[in-house]
């Protein structure tokens, strides 16, 4: 079994009922929904400096991040996965099965990603709900360290159970020791980083890795019922694509639009261009200039358009790049603020494209996830872990699984008791 840590016993977290832990975490997060809360003000400035994102983008991200962390959403996720909060406190009866206790694993190590704001926060709060000791390697903006201070103010036991290593190097002895002692390792990053972390972890540690993935948008012809609705879908698609400069697994980089709707593919492409221009004003690009790869992709699209193949729209100052009908044999452009748009006759073209380019999908946004069962089935078969609503791609629900993995289940082990 993985090595145990004594910090959990010292923190007193295991003696707290899960419902009190959940309530305290929800109360702490509620403070962070106030844009004028001093720790949030300081964190916002640090995130802007680290990521280069503009302040409106960071504020949008923090509103949605902490707005989701409520006692209701935490409870819904936990009860949906393990049956009840009480299962985290001790043995509970189960119909037709032995009594069981979902005991939190003592040591958890969590590694945040370089880009997505607060991506490790849900893992941290659910590990605490499971009464685990938590070591987290955070980015230099120290967002999680600041939130841990707020948790301490709510319940000192929470602060005693979490230790944040902000900006620490992966090879630092203190971090390597925490990684070796962890019974669970949760990590966000690229393939090489995940392999390195896995090799450093204990051989029998539970490893939950979230690699680099991307998202897409699919617009069914039935959704293009009139110009007003098409305009709304275009606006949502633009937000999904441009919000975080195309960073993170939930940024859409590819849009598939079915032909044959009341609003034509060409008209929707024009509406999408207008929407990108508007979103680029509301959420301006970060401080970095367009990368060379973006400029090269733009120039290639311009050359093809001059020959009568496809189209291209380039926002002022490189605020967005919209490429219409790029060659299907080319891999999709997973580039900052870059969106490729394809006209299709049916969902089979989407699945063929994804399969031929081995696109690692995290989510696909559609107009109405409940309205198109054939499309949703194809999305599920493509490897995507989530079917989102257009315009809400960047706002995942805390009560839902992430990356196809449960929220609380990675941090518990079941202990059964015979009758």
Model-derived features: where do they sit?
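Conserved NAD(P)+-binding/catalytic subdomain of aldehyde/semialdehyde dehydrogenases
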Residues: 155-259, 397-419
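Conserved small-residue-rich beta-alpha loop and adjacent elements
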Residues: 86-154
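N-terminal Rossmann-like NAD(P)+-binding subdomain of aldehyde/semialdehyde dehydrogenases
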Residues: 1-105, 364
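Short, charged/polar "capping" segments at the starts of alpha-helices
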Residues: 145, 194, 369-376
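Donor nucleotide-activated moiety binding/catalytic core segment of transferases
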Residues: 93-109, 168-179, 320-336
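Well-ordered, non-membrane alpha-helical segments in soluble/globular domains
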Residues: 2, 227-238, 265-274
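Structural motif
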Residues: 112-113, 187-191, 220-222, 257-260, ...
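NAD(P)-dependent aldehyde/semialdehyde dehydrogenase
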Residues: 244-252, 256-362, 373-417
């Amino acid at each position: 079994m993985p090595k145990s840590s004594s910090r959990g016993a010292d923190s007193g977290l295991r003696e707290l009922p899960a419902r009190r832990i959940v309530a305290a975490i929800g109360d702490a997060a509620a403070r962070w929904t106030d844009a004028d809360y001093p720790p949030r003000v300081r964190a916002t400035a640090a995130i802007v400096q680290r990521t280069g994102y503009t302040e409106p983008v960071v504020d949008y991200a923090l509103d949605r991040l902490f707005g989701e962390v409520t006692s209701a959403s935490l409870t819904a996720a936990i009860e949906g996965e393990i049956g009840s909060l009480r299962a985290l406190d001790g043995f509970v009866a189960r119909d037709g099965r032995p009594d069981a206790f979902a005991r939190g694993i003592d040591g958890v190590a969590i590694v945040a990603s370089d880009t997505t704001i607060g991506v490790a926060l849900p893992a941290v709060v659910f590990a605490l709900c499971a009464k685990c000791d938590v070591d987290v390697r955070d980015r230099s903006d120290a967002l999680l360290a600041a939130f841990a201070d707020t948790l301490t103010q709510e319940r000192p036991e929470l602060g005693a159970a979490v230790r944040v290593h902000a900006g620490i190097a992966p090879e630092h002895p203190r971090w390597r020791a925490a990684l070796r002692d962890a019974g669970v390792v949760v990590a966000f990053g690229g393939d090489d980083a995940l392999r390195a972390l896995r090799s450093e972890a204990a051989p029998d540690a539970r490893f939950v890795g979230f690699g680099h993935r991307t998202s897409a948008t699919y617009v069914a012809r039935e959704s293009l019922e009139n110009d007003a609705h098409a305009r709304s879908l275009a606006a949502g698609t633009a937000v999904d694509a441009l919000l975080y400069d195309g960073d993170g697994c939930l940024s859409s980089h590819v849009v598939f639009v079915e032909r044959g709707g009341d609003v034509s593919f060409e008209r929707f492409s024009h509406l999408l261009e207008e929407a990108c221009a508007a979103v680029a004003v509301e959420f301006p690009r970060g401080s970095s200039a367009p990368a060379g790869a973006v400029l090269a992709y733009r120039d290639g699209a311009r050359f093809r358009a001059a020959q009568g193949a496809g189209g291209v729209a380039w926002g002022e100052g490189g605020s967005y790049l919209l490429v219409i009908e790029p060659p299907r044999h080319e891999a999709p452009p997973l580039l900052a603020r870059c969106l490729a748009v394809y006209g299709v006759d049916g969902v089979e073209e989407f699945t063929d494209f994804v399969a031929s380019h081995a696109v690692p999908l995290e989510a696909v946004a559609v107009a109405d996830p409940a309205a198109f069962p054939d499309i949703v089935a194809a999305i599920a078969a493509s490897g995507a872990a989530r079917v989102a609503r257009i315009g809400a791609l960047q706002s995942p629900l805390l009560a839902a699984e992430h990356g196809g993995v449960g929220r609380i289940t990675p941090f518990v082990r079941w202990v059964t008791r015979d009758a």
